[in-house]
Amino acid sequence: SSISEKIRCNAKVNDNLQQQAMALYAEMFLNSSNNDVTSGTLSDIAVITMGQSPSGSSYNEDGVGEVFYQGRAEFGFRFPKRRLFTTEPKRMAVAGDVLLSVRAPVGDLNMAYERCCIGRGLGAIHSKTGHSSFVLYTMFALRSQLNVFNGEGTVFGSINRDALNAIPIDVPLVTKIDQFEAVAHPIDELIRTNYEENCRLEAIRNSLLPKLMSG
């Protein structure tokens, strides 16, 4: 159907937009012989909250309480899919925080679409300076370092808050981060807008399907 085609088209556009932002990040921070950096750690640019699971009896699928994500099972291309809610939220993330899978496989990423409660399979990475896009693409660039925490063979991989805080990074000048954010943030906003349109289109498609099936 044309609705499905539009959904596919938006998804393709979002993939392309993300690749553009990643290429810009690589150009500005990874491939340039940039001497204007200081050696630091992830804790220099972000505040990390480790998830904690509420009691199982507080879960519901009826939209009561806070949106709740247990782990990476709900992850989408950029934003997780709402499934569960909890009336006893413990640890929260806010819109724009990076959501990181902290249990095997460690390193899968999404972004919080809205305020949400995070379970023990996730950590939330919040920019200290309002540079949410810079933090997101920094985390993408750290995937290979995070992969080290995936256990070999039967060992169950995980990463804790101390290890996350201590991940070494090069911290660029704030002016350079601002330059990146000025281009990348509008790209990320466009990804969000396309995602929202796809959510609306999927809702329309799902409401039309039964009618079409029954003729």
Regions found by a protein language model. Name each.
Residues 70, 87-144, 149-155, 159-164:
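A short beta-sheet element
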Residues 19-20, 32, 79, 92-93, ...:
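Short, intrinsically disordered/low-complexity patches at protein termini
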Residues 56-58, 150-151, 195-196:
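A short, aromatic/hydrophobic, helix- or strand-capping loop or linear motif
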Residues 64, 89, 106-107, 151, ...:
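Short, flexible segments with low predicted structural confidence
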Residues 40-59, 64-95, 113, 118-119:
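Sequence-specific dsDNA recognition surfaces
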Residues 1-53, 74, 170, 174-215:
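Non-catalytic DNA-recognition/assembly elements of restriction-modification systems
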